[in-house]
Design a protein with these regions (language model features):
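Conserved alpha-helix/loop element of class I SAM-dependent methyltransferases that forms part
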Residues: 31-54
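A conserved beta-strand element that flanks and buttresses the S-adenosyl-L-methionine
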Residues: 148
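Conserved SAM-binding strand-loop segment of SAM-dependent methyltransferases
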Residues: 124-134
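Conserved SAM-binding motif I beta-strand of class I
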Residues: 76-82
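N-terminal, positively charged/glycine-rich alpha-helical extensions of SAM-dependent methyltransferases
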Residues: 1-27
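Conserved SAM-binding loop of SAM-dependent methyltransferases across substrates and taxa
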Residues: 63-75
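S-adenosyl-L-methionine-dependent methyltransferase catalytic module, highlighting the catalytic core
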Residues: 109, 135-139, 144, 157-258
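Conserved class I S-adenosyl-L-methionine
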Residues: 54-62
Length: 259
């Protein structure tokens, strides 16, 4: 396992070198536009969990909107994310120029990291970041009360391994937020529930070579089972909507707690 190298601050990048995943009101700058606008719905996104006074580990902070919101709510936040030095879990379609796709994604991630540090300075954030793979959570990363995984598992080749590696660092609660499966998937979920089966939907399509960066649709029941196996058996599921560009997207949050 790698050692945990926490980054506390970086030189503030030029905004022209930034990409913002979240729409945010950045102090001293104003509104920046991103794909997701979670403003005013952060509490629902986190399943109503009170983070005040808690040590929180956020996996996949992206532009940091949820990170900075949790700080304003009184949490001490640490984040784990990718940098341009790590590879996204791309789907390795045969015949696809995966090397070019990986290079393009790494360049995009660097701009995303820049957006985080631009906002980090503007908000006066004290959050720290470790850059690395979720599969290789450093043993010396420390212990946290709460961990959050916002729209992360669907992008991972092995979502359970990531959750398992995370679980040893969390003492109280893991919060998993994801996109709600579509109508067809929900029908199969109901049938699966009746049969005692927890469906997992594989999204990559060899004929289209798409999607390139998303592997799964996970049902709330499956994530609840993941959490139970990992030692967080007291589970609560909530549903909500969030804004993705100009659309309202159905989401769910699974909160798993230790006994």
């Amino acid at each position: 396992m790698p050692e945990c190298d926490w980054v506390l601050e970086r030189p503030v990048p030029a905004i022209t070198d930034c990409h913002f995943y979240h729409t945010m009101d950045v102090p001293g700058h104003g509104l920046v536009h991103g794909e997701w606008d979670l403003r005013g719905r952060e509490e629902e996104y986190l399943g109503g969990v009170d983070v005040s006074g808690k040590r929180v580990l956020e996996l996949g902070t992206a532009s940091g909107h949820i990170c900075f919101w949790m700080e304003r709510m009184g949490a001490a936040v640490s984040a784990l994310d990718l940098s341009g030095d790590q590879e996204w879990d791309m789907v390795p379609y045969h015949g696809l120029d995966l090397g070019r796709r990986i290079a393009d994604r790494q360049s995009h991630i660097e701009r995303l990291n820049n957006g985080f540090w631009f906002a980090h300075a503007a908000f006066g954030s004290k959050a720290r970041v470790h850059y690395g793979s979720v599969y290789d959570m450093p043993e010396d990363a420390g212990q946290f009360d709460i961990a959050t995984m916002g729209s992360i598992l669907l992008h991972l080749r092995d979502p359970f391994l990531a959750l398992q590696r995370l679980s040893g660092h969390v003492g109280e609660t893991i919060i998993v937020t994801d996109m709600r499966p579509g109508l067809k998937c929900r029908v199969f979920d109901r049938i699966g529930g009746f049969l005692g089966i927890r469906p997992l939907y594989f999204l990559p399509d060899a004929g289209r070579c798409e999607p390139i960066d998303t592997w799964w649709r996970l049902s709330p029941g499956l994530i609840a089972e993941f959490l139970g196996i990992a030692g967080f058996p007291d589970v609560r599921i909530t549903r909500h909507r969030q804004k993705l560009q100009d659309r309202e997207i159905e989401m769910f949050t699974v909160v798993g707690s230790r006994r």
